């Protein structure tokens, strides 16, 4: 499954989505910081599977529906940061979809995730990530799962990797930094966690109107 994830910077990069879907032959497109009410039902060959409604910074997932049947989708709230309490509503931080491959009948889970901002502690983000993984498992236990998005976790990534390994998830970072807002500050904010998949690399797409660069990956079911 080919997945692209993109933080739109408060919907600023929304005009790029149709071009991305077509140019990169995307199967699943995961969005963060989108305006759910302004999203089209289709982007080229992709259909809108679901989006958040109550969140100030929306999440959405588009799916190639001629290849994948959309079985179910669900929005999950995770632990709130101080930022979430002050600038509510912002606690819907995972949108997960349960898909079935129309060709081989295999089920997969894909999640679009947006962690608390850098004003929160890494320990809170680790709890949010663990809670998001639990939410995905609740949709379909033992189903291969991949979660992509803006993790807001540019430092001390080895500690996060150790935590994920104990829970059965692997972390894959991008080949280049994904956050480019300031010339003197960039980082690997957007990456991938997965279980039951093999992911060789996570590539970064050219910069657009967002302060994040979109990421692209091909996830193969583990043997």
Where are these regions (language model features)?
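Structural motif
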Residues: 10-17, 124-126
């Amino acid at each position: 499954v080919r997945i692209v994830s993109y933080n739109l910077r408060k919907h600023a990069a929304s005009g790029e989505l149709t071009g991305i879907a077509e140019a990169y032959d995307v199967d699943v497109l995961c969005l963060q910081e989108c305006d759910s009410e302004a999203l089209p039902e289709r982007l080229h060959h992709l259909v809108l599977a679901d989006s958040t409604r109550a969140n100030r910074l929306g999440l959405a997932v588009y799916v190639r529906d001629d290849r994948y049947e959309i079985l179910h989708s669900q929005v999950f709230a995770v632990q709130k940061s101080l930022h979430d309490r002050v600038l509510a509503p912002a606690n819907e931080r995972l949108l997960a979809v349960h898909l079935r491959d129309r060709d081989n009948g295999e089920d997969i889970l894909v999640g679009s995730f947006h962690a608390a901002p850098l004003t929160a502690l890494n320990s809170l983000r680790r709890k949010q990530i663990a809670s998001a993984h639990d939410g995905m498992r609740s949709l379909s236990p033992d189903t291969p799962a991949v979660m992509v998005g803006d993790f807001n976790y540019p430092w001390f990534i080895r500690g996060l990797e150790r935590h994920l390994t104990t829970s059965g998830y692997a972390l894959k970072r991008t080949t280049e930094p994904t956050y480019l807002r300031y010339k003197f500050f960039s980082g690997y904010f957007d990456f991938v966690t997965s279980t039951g998949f093999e992911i060789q690399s996570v590539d970064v797409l050219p910069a657009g109107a967002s302060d994040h660069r979109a990421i692209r990956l091909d996830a193969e079911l583990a043997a």
